[in-house]
Amino acid sequence: MPWLVVMKPRDRLLGVGARGAPPRYDPAAMRAIALFVALAFGWSWGLGFVASGMKATAPMPSAALMMVAGFGPSLAAGAVAVLSSGSAGLRAWMLRCLEWRVGSGWFLLAFLAPPALMVCGLALHSALGGPLPALPDASQIPLVIANFGLVLLIGGPLGEEFGWRGYLMPSLTARTNWRAASLVIGVVWGLWHLPLFFMAGTAQALMPIPV
């Protein structure tokens, strides 16, 4: 690609300077980031609106297409990695996504903290006089577990995080601090999800839009 300089695959993908110093502004790297955002939004929004339009007449294909639409960020990151450095760039991106950066205790905490907080919230709700939700009967437990696994793996991490965390975060922190990068990603992430609040049948459509 004419707008990319010749560097090592990982450095080229992140836009790091030839001597390893992260430039504050690198036109080639910024174009790569802009391309990632455009591809992520174009894929997810385009398929999402198509899926929403066919929901009334073909609910199952619509649901499947909506799930595929959620892979926009990860697919966009892979595409930009290939355009930047070919197969070597794709391999460098995938290795970075799968890199074990913290101890196993942090993964255990991340896995257990959400259900623990939910239990605490239900306990507080009950202590204040609120009713507890009905538990599923035994026949529904396998379905609940399968749904949990589907959402845990496919509903976000595989489709989104390889893009937001695997590509966009390191690309931004190569030229700014992590706080500013996190703020930018938060805005992009929010805008990427925005159409779901206006599509009937999505979980977001049942939620208010916070201001």
What role is predicted for each listed range?
Residues G163-T173, F197-P208:
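Membrane-interface interhelical connector segments
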Residues G159-G186:
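Membrane-interface helix/loop boundary segments of multi-pass membrane proteins
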Residues R24-P157, I185, F198, T202:
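Specific transmembrane helices
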Residues R10-M30:
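Short, Lys/Arg-rich, polar N-terminal cytosolic tail immediately upstream
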Residues S44, A181-L194:
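Small-polar-interrupted transmembrane alpha-helices in polytopic inner-membrane proteins
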